Amino acid sequence: MLRLPTVLRQMRPVSRALAPHLTRAYAKDVKFGADARALMLQGVDLLADAVAVTMGPKGRTVIIEQSWGSPKVTKDGVTVAKAIDLKDKYKNIGAKLVQDVANNTNEEAGDGTTTATVLARSIAKEGFEKISKGANPVEIRRGVMLAVDAVIAELKKQSKPVTTPEEIAQVATISANGDKDIGNIISDAMKKVGRKGVITVKDGKTLNDELEIIEGMKFDRGYISPYFINTSKGQKCEFQDAYVLLSEKKISSVQSIVPALEIANAHRKPLVIIAEDVDGEALSTLVLNRLKVGLQVVAVKAPGFGDNRKNQLKDMAIATGGAVFGEEGLNLNLEDVQAHDLGKVGEVIVTKDDAMLLKGKGEKAQIEKRIQEITEQLEITTSEYEKEKLNERLAKLSDGVAVLKVGGTSDVEVNEKKDRVTDALNATRAAVEEGIVLGGGCALLRCIPALDSLKPSNEDQKIGIEIIKRALKIPAMTIAKNAGVEGSLIVEKILQSSSEIGYDAMLGDFVNMVEKGIIDPTKVVRTALLDAAGVASLLTTAEAVVTEIPKEEKDPGMGAMGGMGGGMGGGMF
């Protein structure tokens, strides 16, 4: 007879004792029909309620607990949506689907996440109600999408292009929750770097917001030796109308740089050397000549590493009209340098931390071609790090970079304002791209008559169109509700008024929205509706929901430990 080893015989009762506490990792729970939809809708409601309170000029803030640091105070819809994670799996699925709506709208338009969330809730809620009364969910979805297409076509008709800096400031002000200072600073930034220029948002170091414009090519590498300083003001090296020598390789030999120095001297121009490194005999000779005969030269290490360094050097060559020595595929030796191989810049400023090449003399056509190449790479890449580096390179080649430095008295205040500045910046870019429509939810209200002419194929599609008709009133109603007035009355008054009249929630009065500058970017309104309708109408077609049953993790030794604790307690006294 086969006998089990003693160890295994002893283990069998233990395994039986553990058995009740173990559940399979792949066990699932399934709910069907109305039960599943009701639970998902509770999740949708919870998330939408939390996000909706932030809507409009009199919307409130939401305080979010964070795993580290102080709580986050925000009025940004997508930030609130992302923070919500519900314990109940079915409710959480509903919440996560609406979270996706907010995320998609934010990624595509950069703003309008609160509008998208309240629209999604309205469409899902009405859809569930009609399905419970026997309507066909697939046909309802078709009706919804038919209505959405008609609304988008109407929005395009209403849309007007953004033409003046004042309109840009108005769009930014509305998106920044009525903060005119933010609106003006964004308008100034766009004026200075162009509508397609690069604008970045950073933490400031003062109480006030500041705008810094960085023109030309700036990189974070300073002079190799402080002996290159040629001005007493600010410990920097400054040259006008200089030549630029670019090298991918390290320069150690003095013979390799003599030809370039001779060319610069013959043309009576300063020389800027940008290489992987300049050391040894080459560096000591440059410093000695700088000190003894006043040689106009400065040596700087090339920025970045690996391929990024090669790309940045190539960008500099194109911007200055020079060539990169040591570049793969080019048989260029430093000893054979000609005047046309050197880049040319109108001004150079080098400090101990960074260098700036201004007014490069590169060919416009070549620079445009390089910008196009980088733009194409940006569209392909999925890496956030790569995107950041490509955007930096793009900024240096284009009209420069505008840096918005957000000020405040504390980190909490700066972070809250940064959210609003980022939203305002995204809204402004969207407005420049596709134009503007009436703000305050009025644009969607003005689209309702366009749905009357639609001809649905059946009654269920007609229900889908009616769902969108009612949903289009929700953004304006939510803004009014947050301002402390009855939303349905406000909506009815707007619908009875002339086309440009709307409700100014800040003043609590009916005004001409265009004259008051209460406008929204067309792209933001369009994207919010499209994303909300797409996800919410899909949600209504769900008939079954599958979730994972969480694993029970109980420590079988805990009971014994509890006994020990009691015994030990008795022994202590």
From Swiss-Prot:
Cystine pairs: none
The protein's enzyme class: isomerase
Phosphoserine modifications at: 67, 70, 410, 488
Cellular compartments per GO CC: cytoplasm; migrasome; mitochondrial matrix; protein-containing complex; secretory granule; sperm plasma membrane
List of residues binding ATP: 75, 111-115, 440, 520
Transit peptide region: 1-26
Glycyl lysine isopeptide (Lys-Gly) (interchain with G-Cter in SUMO2) crosslink, residue number(s): 551
Recorded family membership: Belongs to the chaperonin (HSP60) family.
Record's function text: Chaperonin implicated in mitochondrial protein import and macromolecular assembly. Together with Hsp10, facilitates the correct folding of imported proteins. May also prevent misfolding and promote the refolding and proper assembly of unfolded polypeptides generated under stress conditions in the mitochondrial matrix. The functional units of these chaperonins consist of heptameric rings of the large subunit Hsp60, which function as a back-to-back double ring.
HAMAP family documented for this protein: CH60 (MF_00600)
Protein name: 60 kDa heat shock protein, mitochondrial
Protein species of origin: Cricetulus griseus (Chinese hamster)
Record lineage: Eukaryota, Metazoa, Chordata, Craniata, Vertebrata
